[in-house]
Amino acid sequence: MTDQPNNDAVANEENGPQFSLQRIYVRDLSFEAPKSPAIFRQEWTPTVSLDLNTRQKQLEGDFYEVVLTLSVTVNNGDEVAFIVEVQQAGIFLIKGLDDGAMSHTLGAFCPNILFPYAREAIDNLVVRGSFPALMLAPVNFDALYAQELQRMQEAGETPTVQ
């Protein structure tokens, strides 16, 4: 037994797949309550609509930016109570993956990391707007990625990173 590092093990570790979160940040954030303060005097019977989108782009070398956009519109009856949108972004170091694994990592794994931060930002804005807390349910980004991949295959498209 020796205390010397195994050069083969070090080389394999450097050449193997690597994934590292470099930074998480809010890229854009907005909150609108067009009917306040009148909306606060109404009975609260909300309906929630959630739209989400992801995009990714290669920055330099093996660094990628992934942006998760969540847009939430809450109606109370026929009126819009509030609209909140967040673009939660992250910079990731990703290397040593084949095209399929890279596409899945950028399209599902990274958004899974970003979602709790976006959900917290939305809840915080909603509460600061004097509305009841809004805890969004978890999103299955693997299933959404699989659906998008199937749609692209049927359309003859291939996933790309811009």
Curated annotation (Swiss-Prot):
The keyword Protein transport applies. Its main location: cytoplasm. GO terms for cellular component: cytoplasm. GO terms for molecular function: unfolded protein binding. One of its GO terms (biological process) is protein folding. Keywords: Chaperone, Cytoplasm, Protein transport, Translocation, Transport. The keyword Chaperone applies. It is found in: Cytoplasm. Belongs to the SecB family. One of the proteins required for the normal export of preproteins out of the cell cytoplasm. It is a molecular chaperone that binds to a subset of precursor proteins, maintaining them in a translocation-competent state. It also specifically binds to its receptor SecA. Homotetramer, a dimer of dimers. One homotetramer interacts with 1 SecA dimer. This is Protein-export protein SecB. The gene is secB.
